[in-house]
Amino acid sequence: MKIKEFMSNKKGASGIGTLIVFIAMVLVAAVAASVLINTSGFLQQKASTTGKESTEQVASGLQISQVMGMHNNSNINKTAIYISPNAGSSAIDLSQAVIMLSDGSNKRVYKYNESSYKDLTNGGDIFDNANVEWIKATATKFGIVVIQDADESCTAANPVINKGDLVAITLNTTSFSTTPRTSITGTVQPEFGAPGIISFTTPATYLNDSKVVQLQ
């Protein structure tokens, strides 16, 4: 009788122990599942953000439609680079852009000068010597001439360009040796996205009756 009672108690204790182990396993599995779900959610959000940034990086950038120059019979002393955002590009803040230009012997880095800004959306002569973008031009600062800007996003203090905008970057290139047949290379590098590529060779001769020439 005592043996049967002992065996019954032993089975009861064993059943309780098994139940405790089972509950512990369920709790551990629940915690593990919660951690996995949270980690999965974080990784998904991170991947989505990274993918969006990568898409913006690839799609965004600048394109150069043409480069015009004005010469003084021996060198190109004024250069205007016409730029617009790439198709599908995010808005680009030109105050953060950097322009690098080289003639093979010299290299110049230009940054934006807020005082060298001109709005010509109603028309005008970009190469007019009286324009502030040339008066304030230096060997290290570039100016901006706004040609097309429907939403008026490109201002002197915040020169941001977006879809449909067209501006000219103005450079004082007097410090370069841009004599005839000189190769010029460079980039207009925005804060993010693809740069605009500058690559041209100056004309074989500079004619008095044609002060403004197309370079690229």
Curated annotation (Swiss-Prot):
User: Where found, per UniProt?
Assistant: Archaeal flagellum
Specify the propeptide location in this chain.
1-12
Among its keywords, does the record have Glycoprotein? yes
Query: Keywords, A to Z?
Result: Archaeal flagellum, Glycoprotein
Would I find Metal-binding among this entry's keywords? no
Where do the record's glycosylation annotations fall on this chain? N38, N72, N77, N113, N172, N208
Provide the family line: Belongs to the archaeal flagellin family.
Q: Mind telling me what this protein is named?
A: Flagellin B2
- In its UniProt entry, the species of origin is given as Methanococcus voltae
Taxonomy, top ranks, is: Archaea, Methanobacteriati, Methanobacteriota, Methanomada group, Methanococci
Gene symbol of the encoding locus: flaB2
